[in-house]
């Protein structure tokens, strides 16, 4: 079984974890037809993508 030779410091632990934070979604697009907000390159909740109806509900 592997055993560490030196204990990692709090600083090294923090540096390793520095990229683990979650970021907020900043790039929301507005659909031309319905004016609804959605993630880029995704359809809206009512089935529109780039002004066209792609899924019939």
Swiss-Prot record:
Keyword rRNA-binding among record annotations: no
GO molecular function: structural constituent of ribosome
Keyword terms: Ribonucleoprotein, Ribosomal protein
Cited NCBIfam families: rpmF_bact
PANTHER family assigned to the protein according to its UniProt record, in alphabetical order: 50S RIBOSOMAL PROTEIN L32 (PTHR35534), LARGE RIBOSOMAL SUBUNIT PROTEIN BL32 (PTHR35534:SF1)
Organism: Klebsiella pneumoniae subsp. pneumoniae (strain ATCC 700721 / MGH 78578)
Domain of life the protein comes from: Bacteria
Extent of the signal sequence: none
Pfam families in UniProt: Ribosomal_L32p
Keyword RNA-binding found: no
Family statement: Belongs to the bacterial ribosomal protein bL32 family.
Location of the region described as Disordered in the Swiss-Prot/TrEMBL record: 1-37
GO cellular component, one term: large ribosomal subunit
SUPFAM superfamilies xref list: Zn-binding ribosomal proteins (SSF57829)
Coiled coil (residue ranges): none
Protein name: Large ribosomal subunit protein bL32
Gene Ontology biological process terms, A to Z: translation
